Amino acid sequence: MGLKEIFKKQGGLNLIKQYHESGVLKTALGEFFLLGRDKKALEILRLSVQFKVKQRLEKKYKRQIQYFDENYKDKKIHEKSNKVWVCWFQGLENAPELVKKCYKSLQANLTDREIILITSENMDQYVKFPKFILEKWEKGYITNTHMTDLLRLELLIYYGGMWIDSTVLCTRKIEEISEYYFDSDLFFYQLLKPGRDGQAQLISSWLM
């Protein structure tokens, strides 16, 4: 694959803009010319850039993070919950057939769980976001994908239970699923050791 095809596939000018705004453009270019352009090299480049961004954010917000850690007091009593959270902002009636089938598979198999579908219409019944967050979402600065990242954290913090992405198909009955999926204090999939293709995933949030 040529440089032009790789550039276009990885996001083109939008990727360059994103890396520039994140302050990691030099790192990305250096890694690209150092590692090469095969699949494994590009995956390692992505991980390297992610780590660099994380370092920059930790440095930038070090004082705020330290203040939060020292002053935050969780007064909420956390109890075991049987809630399963799913989100499709447009409502199930407007969802693709894939999402409808996945949602029905949860209802059919997780029969002892309270499955709750979050939409743009009922979201404020469960969580309250600051006005500036909602305004950025309405204007498109925060995408639906990024909004669900905020939403899943708020729901799990305040209500507990499990978050499942709307495109996850459940193929086993609740009795066949290991209890630690539901009963752990915190559960998510991760891949810590890079595989042969260089892929690693610290946190995969499609099921939490």
Q: Where does each model-flagged region fall?
A:
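Short, glycine/charged-enriched secondary-structure capping and boundary segments
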Residues: 99-100, 131-132, 177-179
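Intrinsically disordered, low-structural-confidence terminal and linker regions
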Residues: 1-22
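A general structural signal for short secondary-structure junctions and capping/turn motifs
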Residues: 75-77, 107, 179, 197-200
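N-terminal anchoring/stem segment of glycosyltransferases
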Residues: 17-129
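Short catalytic/ligand-binding loop motif for oxyanion handling, primarily in non-cytosolic enzymes
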Residues: 93-95, 124-127, 171-174, 178, ...
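GT-A fold catalytic core of metal-dependent nucleotide-sugar glycosyltransferases
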Residues: 145-192, 199, 203
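Conserved hydrophobic/aromatic beta-strand scaffold that supports enzyme active sites
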Residues: 205-207
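Active-site-proximal specificity loops/subdomain of glycosyltransferases
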Residues: 114-150, 154
